[in-house]
Structures are given as C-alpha cells and as structure tokens.
C-alpha cells in the first residue's frame, strides 16, 4: 500500500495496527507517515545520485589505492609484484614510508618486466625517468624484479648501516691517564679472581 500523504494514512489508519490512544504507537505512526511522504518526493525526483552523496564518499576515502601497494598496520606501505619470469611468484619489493614511493617501486618493476604492456600507477614518463635516475641496467640472465628488489634492499641496508654506525659511537670524557690506569688495574684484578 503506497500512500502519498499523511492524510491518506489517517484515512486508512484502521488498516494499520496502531492504537490512537497509545503514545508509542502514535510516535511510530508519525515516523511511518514521514517516511512515506519522503518516499513519494524521492520517487518523483530523478533517479540520479545526489552530488552531496558523491562528495561525502570521496571525503571519507583518505588514502588512494595503488596497484601493487598494501598498507601495513603500523602505517608503512609495502610494494610487491608477481614475477612472470619466475612462474608468477609474488616478490616483495620493499617497505616504504608513503604510498607514492611504494607505487613507484611497483611501477618500476612492472615497466621493467612488461614494458609498454604494463599497467602503471603513474605516467610512463615518470617511471622511465625514475629508472634512468637509478641507472638500471637489466641483463637477460636475471629477472628485472629481482634486480630492483636488490637495489631497494641495498639502499635500505646502507641507510641502516649509517644509522647503526651513528648509534655505535660512544664519546667518553677525557678523565686523564691516571684514572685510565686505575680502571685497567681494577679490571685486571677482577678477572684474576
């Protein structure tokens, strides 16, 4: 039963299981009446999507999804690709601070593997330029994906070595030669026990 207005509902109230003297029933009745009047307004309007709904949906979506990129629970982004030269094995390319870096790593691997047939996140010119900056030369013996993975892991290792070297350096205050002699003598006497 489709009623176009609240008056129509009042006219047919006997057909609905509402008690006019009960406040809860009347509250429910008013909600049904408002809903039916809104349905008629919506059905008479066009079937297009409201612009408000579209913009609010896009505002909720914060991160852009990139091909070959997954967000880790701790906030980093992992890039990986299926390597067709190795029977479709999934190859982890690296973990990156932001999604764009991870997407570029995926694009580099995809372009190196598939060439112009690759489906990329970024324009081909950007990917080619980034590969040229890395001075990538792929030989026929090795998978280009593995080669890129090695480059990313070497870069990561060199950064971690630099950080480790900075952490391993301990600077002592010069307390004089006499104090150093006392420390050496006391350490020798402890080891002789």
Swiss-Prot record:
Induction: Induced by wounding and infection with the fungal pathogen Botrytis cinerea. Belongs to the AP2/ERF transcription factor family. ERF subfamily. SMART domains: AP2. One of its GO terms (cellular component) is nucleus. Keywords: Activator, DNA-binding, Ethylene signaling pathway, Nucleus, Plant defense, Transcription, Transcription regulation. Residues 41-62 are annotated as: Disordered. It comes from Solanum lycopersicum. PANTHER family: DNA-BINDING DOMAIN, ETHYLENE-RESPONSE FACTOR C3. GO terms for biological process: defense response; ethylene-activated signaling pathway; positive regulation of DNA-templated transcription; regulation of defense response; regulation of ethylene-activated signaling pathway. This is Ethylene-response factor C3.
């Amino acid at each position: 039963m489709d009623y176009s207005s609240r008056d129509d509902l009042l006219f047919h109230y006997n057909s609905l299981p509402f008690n006019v003297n009960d406040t809860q029933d009347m509250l429910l009745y008013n909600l049904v009446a408002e809903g039916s009047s809104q349905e008629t307004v919506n059905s008479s309007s066009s079937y297009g999507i409201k612009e408000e709904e579209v913009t609010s949906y896009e505002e909720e979506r914060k991160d852009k999804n990139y091909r070959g990129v997954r967000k880790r629970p701790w906030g980093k982004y992992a890039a990986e690709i299926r390597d067709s030269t190795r029977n479709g094995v999934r190859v982890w390319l690296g973990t990156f601070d932001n999604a764009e870096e991870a997407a570029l790593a995926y694009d580099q691997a995809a372009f190196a593997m598939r060439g112009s047939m690759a489906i990329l996140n970024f324009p081909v010119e950007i990917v080619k330029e980034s590969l040229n900056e890395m001075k990538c030369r792929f030989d026929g013996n090795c998978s280009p994906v593995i080669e890129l993975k090695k480059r990313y892991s070497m870069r990561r290792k060199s950064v971690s070595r630099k950080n480790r070297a900075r952490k391993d350096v301990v600077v002592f205050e010069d307390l004089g030669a006499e104090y150093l002699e006392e420390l050496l003598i006391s350490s020798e006497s402890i080891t002789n026990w």
